[in-house]
Amino acid sequence: MKGSVLILAAHPDDEVLGRGGTIAKLAHQGLAVHVAFLADGVSSRSGDPTAQQDDLISRRMAAQKACDILGVKSVYFGDFPDNRMDTIALLDIIKPIETLVTKFQADTVFTHHAGDMNIDHRRIHEAVSVACRPQRGHPVKKLLCFEVPSSTEWQLSGAAPTFAPNWFVDISDTLDRKLAAVEAYAAELRPWPHPRSRRGVEHLARWRGAIVGFDDAEAFMLGRQLA
């Protein structure tokens, strides 16, 4: 990879769960990695405005800490409603994504898989697909989709496209940083056995590595590559 990398995620912690080791690896290689969270990640949890604001501040602080651990160059926080992005017109989601792509002149974009259970994930995938159309002069040359434990694999069989990875990144040297970033989101972790537990995240990295001959890996689906 070369140039600028942009991760377009729904919620803080999606970036770590889906590709934290890859972020750390690319940052270590000297690439500018930018992370954008489009939804607030908390507003669906409580009807109390004060509690919502406190949760929002805590979640964003955790996100900044995690991104600092991974070596992210910049972090953007959007304010689309959590778990309600299906109530937003698609064009209104596309526009800020296009602005971010143009701002960072992103050569590579990572985003959610089309078949995730979470509605915000699916909506962002749809918007990114439109925003990154391969028009003449468009900066994005590679579009990859990541998995998110407790969303991607929980979709019902046959209900949506299946995540079938065809692009793997060796994160054997950066798994420790991924797990440290996961710990920054302590409030979002679940006890084992749960795919979004620390142990679950580590197990997934081991499994994704084992199926391609690495100690640890992250798996992606290549949506498009222009060479």
State each model region's role:
Residues 18-41:
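Histidine-anchored nucleotide/phosphate-binding helix
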Residues 16-17, 119:
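Short N-terminal helix/helix-N-cap motif within the alpha/beta-hydrolase-1
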Residues 7-16:
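Short, glycine-rich nucleotide/cofactor-binding loops
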Residues 10, 38-40, 148:
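Cofactor-binding loop segments of dinucleotide-utilizing enzymes, especially the Rossmann-like FAD-
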